[in-house]
Amino acid sequence: LLPQGLRAFALYIQAHYLYLKGEYGPSAGLVEGALSMGAAAYPIPALYLHLVAVMDYMSLKQTEKARAHLLAAWALAQPDDLIEGFGEHHGLLGGMLEAEIKPAWPEDFKRVIAITYRFSAGWRKVHNPETGHDVADDLTTTEFAVSMLAARGWTNQEIAAHLRISPNTVKRYLSAAMEKLHISHRQDL
């Protein structure tokens, strides 16, 4: 049997797998159960569990639950500067870093984004040849976040409210992203 802390991390991996399969509710339930049964005592696995909960709840458009998990993860990360996971998961967090971390902790946000760019460059080197699908590497992190939300069916108004920007700014981000991706329709995101 794995030690308790590793079991908690294994549950993160299982929850992430469910997320990738589009099973957001079961993934969120696994996370909530793991955290309530003692995983919260292990800061690093708990941080990663909270991050996958953000991913799940953003996919379910339950932004308040996503926000609560993001801020719980951030509280765990701050004392020891454990921000790597935020950079690793940026693209899956549905703009939550832009909505919550950027306004309150702008310098930390810049460091997270620097991690995101480094992580993404390495990830694309593995992902693109393995899958045969190119992941865009020239979008800004905000263009990517806005595009991900749009691809998940969020309206410009919903994205604007979530990111606390104007709908016109959302349109500009989407237009820039679509131009860089050489696509002309939102559904192609």
Descriptions of predicted regions:
Residues 2, 32-39, 72-82:
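Amphipathic alpha-helical segments of tetratricopeptide repeats
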Residues 5, 44-45:
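Residue signature of alpha-solenoid helical repeat architecture, marking inter-repeat boundaries
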Residues 104-135:
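Intrinsically disordered or compositionally simple regulatory linkers and C-terminal tails
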Residues 124-175, 179-184, 188:
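Helix-turn-helix DNA-binding segment
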